[in-house]
Amino acid sequence: MDSSQTLDLVRVAVPVPLRRHFDYLSPLPLPEPGCRVEIPFGPQTLVGLVVDHPTESQVPRAKLKPLKRVLDTAPVLGPDILALMAWSAGYYQHPLGEVLPHALPVLVRKGEPAAYRELEFWFATEAGMAIDLNELKQAAKQQQALALLRKGPQTPSALKQEEIQSAALTALEKKGLLEKRSLEPSHDGDWATHFDAGEGLRLNGEQALAVAAVTSQSDKFGAFLLDGITGSGKTEVYLSILEPLLRAGKQALVMVPEIGLTPQTINRFRRRFKVPVVAMNSAMNDRERLDAWLACRDGGAAILIGTRSAVFTPFKNLGIIIIDEEHDGSFKQQDGFRYHARDLAVMRAHRAGIPILLGSATPSLETLHNARTGKYHHLSLTRRAGNAQTARQVILDIKSVRLQAGLSPQLEQLMAEHLVAGNQVMLFLNRRGYAPSLICHQCGWSAACERCDAWYTWHQAGRRLHCHHCDSVRPLPHSCPECGSKELIGSGVGTEQLEQLLTTVFPQYPVVRIDRDNTRRKGELETHLGDIKAGKYKILIGTQMLAKGHHFPDVTLVGLLDVDGALFSADFRAAEKLAQLYTQVAGRAGRASKPGLVVLQSHHPEHALLQDLTQNGYGHFADTALKERRLLGLPPFSYQGLFRAEANGRDEVQLFLARLADTLRSARYPQVQVLGPISGFMERKAGKFRMQLLVQGPNRAPLAQLLDWAVKELDGWPETKKVRWGLDIDPTELN
């Protein structure tokens, strides 16, 4: 930087785990807040964001370093997103320098230009526009390609979706009928001027009331809970609410919990609205995410359908936020910056003065409480759409029953009946792999992870042992390392083992397994889901990713093989999570005109929770659970912050949290409880010893004040050099 230039102060948020900003010198004109700058930081060069123009600095001017480079002439983040991120950093007690990058695509964080890439387009030439298409009747693909391109230019990927391959395009290019040019795509947001919507399904009375309630308040903030049973037509309500907003040129953010729900949601929205719909999820590459982010920011995209991090995306004219499956735990970030996307979305809508719609068949108890206390509007859908009937529910007592790969003879017989009738069957087992552990039949040795207090999971695919906690992998041993016996057997059942059994028991009915192990590659999940809907597979095996929001009209039998573990968990949220999971899985049965049956296998059929769910449904369970939470002073009737700490030694982390507990208690906030420290459910993970300290109070403000004070105190403790700690505000998992 030229030393002869006049320099002034800029304050920069730096992506490091320090709860402060750093001042630098910059030439005039100063980069605006929201602009990226390249800065020297120790021996590194980092990309930070300007957050302020201070008039003075606590550091003597002579010691301040100049910026290396200003990367933007205009802010990449506007004042609305900057303010939202600053609020988030304060609420979740996390350094702003580490919070701000969550609002930026990876390429922008790295300092790449926040600009569109040029795309290649195929055009029909003058000769191509003039030629008689019948001259190409001997080359059907060339004829199809030219006919399409006469209507307008297309990208190679768009042509590929039309099953037009490059060979046909190259042949037409050689004939002088096509040419390829590079252009920057248009993102001027003119989609509203030629808005077109397809005809929707006819709404029933409840759906129409829900649509009217939201659209009548579309010009101001309002939080709405759409509490609709599975199959009640919540998506049709979303679409009907969006239509007048899109027609007015407003953009929409639609959030889904799982990557797997994105393609089907996009297809549904694209079929209804002839507007640009973009996606944002972790399955996309960095360039795709940047293009989607820019299209939203500049107004070129009408609808963004995204997972958790989409909540931070800037929009030119955002008109509504919709959170589908709002109860889902995937909306909570469980490491680093531990934000809850649903709660942040409500705050974003409030700050922007727009409505937010939270949809679920199994609303979280926090959201239900907000609806019942008047903070949210409560909209109910109690009838299944069309002619769909509510599925019959049965609990199978499997005490003393000989199971094969977790499957009882009774459930196997029911499967045979439904398959013979030409229907599909879905089995739910929330445990991937072949078996949860590997043991020696002779001496009892078990394959334990060396870095965690956990067993290795046996994966038959790849013949490996895999720790699902620290991700370490080792080959499947041929013999017992303790006694040398080759009698190594699995303990417990995973989805691989169930798949193996069913291909033997029902060889004439194709089986598909859907879990994280066989849907890692891009497009794999969409392919499987498409094949299921086309009837290629008759038996579906899946973990919870198959239970979320998918519509399988030919599934008439759903079996849940093993949910007993959740009945006796120490986590006070376990019952709520099980109730939601059961209800969501059960909702996959009988969603069209065919009647459905849900079968729950259990060693504890008399358990009050299972009886309540199968006889009275989720709503009754939620009423009971909220009464219990109120009596016990648990969320949503109190607020929590959870300190987690880990270190190489048990004593280090124990002493650190014990001192923190004493410090918190000495602050004398009489209504705030300090519970612990205690070991996590898994004391050792990835070679680190872990403990936690729970801080809880009936009012949010004093709890936040105490935690804010404690965090500032911790910054000066020498123990933090050996102990890694973090604070989780509103924790959803106490482990």
Language model regions located:
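Accessory, non-ATPase domains that flank or precede helicase/AAA+ motor cores in DNA-metabolism machines
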Residues: M1-S360, R372-A388, V420, S666-A667, ...
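A general secondary-structure junction signal
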Residues: D52-P54, L104, S182-E184, L429-R431, ...
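Inter-lobe coupling/hinge segments of SF2-like helicase ATPases
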Residues: G198-N204, A208-V211, K220-Q654, S666, ...
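Short beta-strand elements
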Residues: V512, R668-G680, K721-I729
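Long hydrophobic segments that form regular secondary structure
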Residues: A658-L660
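Juxtacatalytic substrate-recognition/specificity segment
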Residues: K688
